[in-house]
């Protein structure tokens, strides 16, 4: 596997005010301390569990990563209580004839990725304590979806993070190869709609394609959080995808190309702006995109897809 070089200021380090001479062990402890501080605050301030829509479910996908890192059962139990509150479901309609996948927040939008991201957490909880009821609805929904002749389910960038890892997680649990075939088919559609091969970045959705839509300075407008969703999705997919999968190299190549493009957009202070190629479009940090990029890039450094270096900025990858 070819290795690419990344030189990136990690946003979490910048925010935490770490000393440049701190040891790796001290830096790691400080990061874990920040995770505890933030996550404990969130959970104590939000004891009542909300719906299984993306706004809560995206948090729980991160909370489970915090559990895997720390081993703190309180984190896991918080997500488990949320899953139980939502009956281990996303949207709750049982009438398949009314299931939809355009934008909507009612219970008939079962096939909409905003209501499928919760399945990531359910699969993680299943792997910790196997119980078929935890993934019964996830399997029902995804296997129905895969039985249709549609391939345009992922029409916005967010959807790649929301559902791609669901399919690799369920493949690992079930061994059903259709999950990986449909994963690639749906991703190919999303690519054809949103990916810009010249800049190796994704538009938020079809409404933002250049030159139909432009930034304030007439440039291509790539949304930081949207591309953050995608880079993190690719990292999570590669984490679970079999080494023998016939499409694995495609995902690796795309991940590396995006990592190079993302690193080139980083601001000197360590953050990313909302419009990646036009910082003046919305000046200042876009924190959600910065967090996603930090996760996605660090995953590559920690798992042999990217190699950290202190080379000059124009040689970051």
Where are these regions (language model features)?
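Single conserved hydrophobic/aromatic residue that forms the stacking wall/gate
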Residues: 308-317
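Bacterial Sec-dependent N-terminal signal peptides
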Residues: 1-26
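Well-ordered alpha-helical scaffold segments within catalytic/enzyme domains
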Residues: 58-73, 117-131, 163-176, 229-247, ...
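Oxyanion-binding "anion nests"
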Residues: 231, 236-276
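Low-complexity, Ser/Thr/Pro/Gly-enriched N-terminal "stalk/linker" regions
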Residues: 23-98, 128-140, 177
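Aromatic- and glycine-enriched pocket-lining scaffold segments that form the walls
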Residues: 151-205
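Carbohydrate-binding/catalytic loop surfaces
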Residues: 40-43, 60-68, 96-125, 158-170, ...
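Asp-box/WD-like beta-propeller blade repeats and closely related beta-sheet repeat scaffolds
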Residues: 135-161
């Amino acid at each position: 596997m070819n290795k690419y070089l990344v030189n990136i200021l990690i946003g979490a380090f910048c925010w935490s005010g770490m000393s440049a001479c701190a040891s790796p062990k001290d830096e790691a402890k400080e990061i874990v301390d920040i995770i505890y501080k933030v996550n404990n605050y969130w959970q104590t301030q939000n004891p009542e569990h909300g719906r299984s829509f993306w706004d809560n479910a995206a948090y729980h996908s991160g909370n489970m990563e915090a559990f895997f890192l720390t081993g703190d059962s309180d984190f896991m139990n918080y997500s488990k209580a949320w899953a139980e509150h939502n009956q281990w479901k996303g949207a709750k309609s049982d009438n398949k004839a009314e299931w939809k996948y355009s934008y909507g927040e009612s219970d008939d939008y079962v096939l909409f990725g905003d209501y499928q991201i919760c399945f990531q957490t359910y699969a993680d909880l299943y792997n910790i304590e196997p119980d078929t009821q935890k993934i019964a609805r996830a399997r029902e929904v995804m296997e129905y979806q895969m039985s249709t002749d549609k391939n345009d389910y992922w029409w916005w960038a967010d959807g790649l993070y929301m559902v791609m890892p669901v399919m690799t997680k369920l493949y690992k649990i079930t061994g059903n190869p259709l999950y990986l075939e449909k994963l690639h088919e749906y991703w190919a559609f999303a690519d054809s709609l949103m990916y810009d091969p010249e800049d190796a970045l994704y538009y938020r959705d079809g409404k933002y394609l250049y030159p139909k839509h432009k930034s304030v300075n007439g440039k291509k407008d790539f949304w930081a959080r949207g591309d953050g969703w995608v880079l993190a999705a690719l990292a999570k997919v590669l984490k679970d995808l079999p080494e023998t999968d016939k499409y694995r190299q495609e995902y690796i190549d795309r991940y590396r190309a995006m990592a190079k493009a993302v690193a080139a957009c980083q601001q000197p202070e360590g953050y990313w702006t909302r419009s990646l190629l036009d910082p003046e479009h919305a000046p200042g940090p876009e924190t959600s995109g910065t967090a996603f990029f930090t996760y996605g890039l660090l995953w590559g450094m920690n798992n042999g897809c990217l190699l950290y270096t202190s080379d000059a900025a124009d040689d970051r990858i």
